[in-house]
Amino acid sequence: MKLSQKHYLLFRAECEKWLSILGLKSWKVYYQFKKLDDAFALTQWKYSGRVATIILATDFPKPFDNLEKQMKETALHECLEILLSPISDIAGDRHYNQTDFNKEIHSVIRTLEKLLGE
């Protein structure tokens, strides 16, 4: 299934919405629309610089019953990857520091408390 520029703009707008909701506006996020193998979207990041690239595939072999819904869910998924990227980076660091790990876990918890509270 080929995706159009219209799909890309919808996806990007959804990402921007979720970045704002999740409090990730301090991140510099770039977007790409290109061919991906076996993925609908992909996020790459450099936590130390708070820079990320979210890539949407130009085509995907699997048809979706509701493409707009799938794109919105995928945008949220990619933004959640950015939210959790500090934890991912710490977990992959062989010089793992429990204090830093706990700090990042609680940062995510505070974000979720704001979103889910009340």
Q: Where does each model-flagged region fall?
A:
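Post-HEXXH active-site segment of zinc metalloproteases
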Residues: 49-51, 61, 69-70, 82-118
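Short alpha-helical catalytic segment bearing the HExxH-like zincin motif
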Residues: 70-78
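Zn2+-dependent metallopeptidase catalytic core
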Residues: 5-27
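N-terminal soluble segments of membrane proteins
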Residues: 1, 9-11, 27-32, 38
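Intrinsically disordered, low-complexity boundary segments flanking structured domains
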Residues: 13-19, 38-43, 71
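Alpha-helix boundary/N-cap detector
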Residues: 2, 6-10, 74, 100
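Catalytic zinc-binding patch centered on the HExxH motif and its immediate surroundings
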Residues: 31-56, 60, 64
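Ordered, soluble secondary-structure elements with a strong preference for glycine-centered loop motifs
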Residues: 5, 65-70
